[in-house]
Amino acid sequence: MSRAKRIVICGGGAIGVAIAYFCSRRGARPVVIERHAVAGAASGKSGGFLAFDWCRDSALDQLTRRSFHLHADLAAELGNPWGYRRLATYGGYAIENDPALGPGPRPWLAGRVAITGRLGSPRTTALVEPHAFTMGLMRAAQAHGAELQRGVIAGLVRRPGGAVVGVVLEGGELVEADAVIIAMGPWSTLAAQWLPLPAVFGYKGHSLVFDTGETIPAEALFLEYQEASGEVLTPELFPRGDGTTWICAISTARPVPIDPADVAPDEGAYARLEAMCRNISPALAAAPIRTRQACFRPVTEDGLPLIGRVPGVDGAYVATGHSVWGMLNAPATGEAMAELILDGAARQVDLAPFAAGRLRALDPA
Ligand SMILES: Cc1cc2nc3c(=O)[nH]c(=O)nc-3n(C[C@H](O)[C@H](O)[C@H](O)COP(=O)(O)OP(=O)(O)OC[C@H]3O[C@@H](n4cnc5c(N)ncnc54)[C@H](O)[C@@H]3O)c2cc1C
């Protein structure tokens, strides 16, 4: 009987744990190595919004449609401890200094917010609580035999011919593997020191989580909001099944600190976000703020993720750069990576558009 493949997954975000889950379900032995905390970066702080067909004119379309279905399946199979729910989604706008016109059709929204149309129905849009989703998938993977190890990936173990056969942790420990996957979100760019990989950048986003109880119905909102200064923000507001409401705005290109624990907000960003929330919603103005948070989403030069083999290096794989759709696309990425590593090719989605070799590799110096 052949021995189960040992697969080292660098990074315990949604992408890493989804790969661990699908590999473990197939009888492999994945080990997730995480520096800070599972779901401790964007995968625990993001919006968790899912859309079936919002990538229809992009190379992401097939991945996204597959993933939307897998989210429903995973919630059903694993008891939905992450509040997966379908909901309608609307778009609109507001101007900070517009006089409030009295309550509109939605009493929880200020009268100055104009809803301009429906962007999605419960058939096409859904939501998960991302921290619970990422933790839940990690636990499900562990139930199938996956391991979680705390450690900082500091290098790779190579055979004389160049094949990757493990990782080196800070402190010197070696962890052997039949396959190594770089899934460290924006920190994946560190792996370009060891592998021919393109740059992965980080875009910072700020968000607040309010305890809104029953005051906000199950409707997601995408707004354009003009501040008194004239600057336009594009807030997204997602009411969750657990009685909280997540809202974000203010994305900035900032250097990513080496240690994910050191991610900090831009000066003044939370105050600006809180002022906006008071302005658009009396329900938010009255609700306690449970969490103020900032995180980086991973982005490549052309906006598409890197999913597949590292070109020219046996045993090395990459899965990162999912930008604004990492929570949505985690399941189909996990499934495809498990197929690629265990069967030699992905069957459900074509990974060709996501090949790392399409972009120029960083100079390892
Ligand atoms: C504000 C905001 C809102 C978003 N909203 C949505 C949304 O509504 N829907 C959606 O689909 N997507 C959304 N996204 C995008 C989504 O959150 C990301 O694409 C996704 O979380 C990326 O997951 P990841 O696993 O690649 O990276 P991460 O979540 O960043 O995980 C990477 C992990 O690697 C670890 N790591 C780093 N360095 C090392 C090292 N040296 N050794 C070991 N481990 C290391 C980190 O600690 C981290 O846990 C949003 C993103 C942001 C910023």
Report each predicted region and the residues it spans.
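Active-site substrate-recognition segment that forms the wall
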Residues: 21-22, 48-50, 82-85, 186-312
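Flavin (FAD/FMN) cofactor-binding and adjacent substrate-gating region
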Residues: 73-151, 155-163, 168, 299
